[in-house]
Amino acid sequence: EIQKLKKEKMLCWLYDEDRWPSGSAGGIVTKNVQYRSRFLVFEPEGVDKEEKEEFMSAAKAVRSKNRFLLGSYRIILNEEGRLKSYQSLKTEKPNEAGEIWSAWLEVSGDTPWFNNQAYVNTLDKNAINQFIEITHQEYYKRFADEFGKTIPGIFTDEPQTCHKEVLSEPFEKKAVILPFTDDFDDTFQKRYGFSILECIPELIWERENGEISQARY
């Protein structure tokens, strides 16, 4: 109790979550699918969907069927596994060389770690505002008089995006997960003048000529 702490001349640091990492308010925020974590899935044509982890104490991507296509690409690698060429496909051209990879925006599925909900979309200001309203503002409603006194602050525990993945070797055929959100490409274009979706293969493979991809930085 606050009064007991005051009597003992102790401070009360508040915690804003029921477990690590902060953001979902114990799954309350992410009952609204709009506020769930999103991620980009980049995968080769015909790849089998990976097994879902039974238990996961992290904000790693949780695969689901809730996704939509962002784009498809024809990829050609050289003998060393470097990116020789690629093109964004608007229409399928089955007789051309190369392998087809596709990028999907996927919404996080349920996981027991977040009370059978999902982690929050930390790239969405509205989602985080909802988290603050449910947690920090609720604390303030109850203990406003003690903020800045007995209560010096609120501890937020490592909010994060989904974990970024890479291929273990350039010819590996598996899905690669990257942090992403609904307006990521629009925001990127406004800031840098080109679409990140046009350059997704450069985030996965090294260029054949050894040049550094501007899109990575």
Question: Which residue ranges define each predicted feature?
Answer:
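Mature extracytoplasmic enzyme cores
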Residues: 1-217
